[in-house]
């Protein structure tokens, strides 16, 4: 890889892209943010608005309208562009529309000499991250999807509300597809250092309460989309967290969409799992110790993604 500084190129300034840009600028994560969008007038307004807010941020981030030529020396290209999820529409139903959009974007990025990392947020994110990897020709460690970073945040937040403890003291992951087949990993989860597995053994009535929390986690996007049209702030902050881990070389475990090479008995798919993130991208995938029931649910999630992936990228082609 070759790049200078911490320039981030954001492609797509819709609700998610702008929320990410705001989080990035507000937290002072990048040196420079170049934004590309097909709506030039709205983009100009967003760039002005964000630039004025830099005065009160902790770090001076240069925000400007970008072009694909800015990708040449960028550390990261973050893709938030694509058709939006409509009320009642699953993430996987978006796939046909958005794969073609990814192909066009990635071709432009790579044609301009990009040699950094891709971070993909467009849904269905696991499938589209695989598509970006295929279209780019980069090593899979350099193509990352937002995965279950938002689902995990939602799950930890709701557990924190139940137990009246900070979500930062909760270590519990949502893994699998960022979508309807995702699953919680309770067998290795802890709350303030206390094993959730042991809590379940002591209190069998806890299981249905936790299942309800998981269902609320899984279905949160549908409720938010129905209420306000899109999800934006949570995923924007999740993307900013991944970006900070990369640019600051943090070697931190985050639940992202990562390429599997035998972990969990699966390979050649992108799927949500904890992974160690540093300046090089995905340093390694963390294979959690999960129960037989959790493994069965994970396999179902992987098979769901694989079926869609194989339709787009047939095996052997």
Swiss-Prot record:
Known catalytic reactions: (S)-lactate + NAD(+) = pyruvate + NADH + H(+)
List of residues binding substrate: 85, 91, 123-126, 151-154, 231
Gene Ontology MF terms in the entry: L-lactate dehydrogenase activity
Name of a matching Pfam family: Ldh_1_N
Active site per database record: 178 (proton acceptor)
Entry's Gene Ontology BP terms: glycolytic process; lactate metabolic process
Keyword annotations from UniProtKB, A to Z: Allosteric enzyme, Cytoplasm, NAD, Oxidoreductase, Phosphoprotein
Subunit (UniProt): Homotetramer.
The protein, known as: L-lactate dehydrogenase
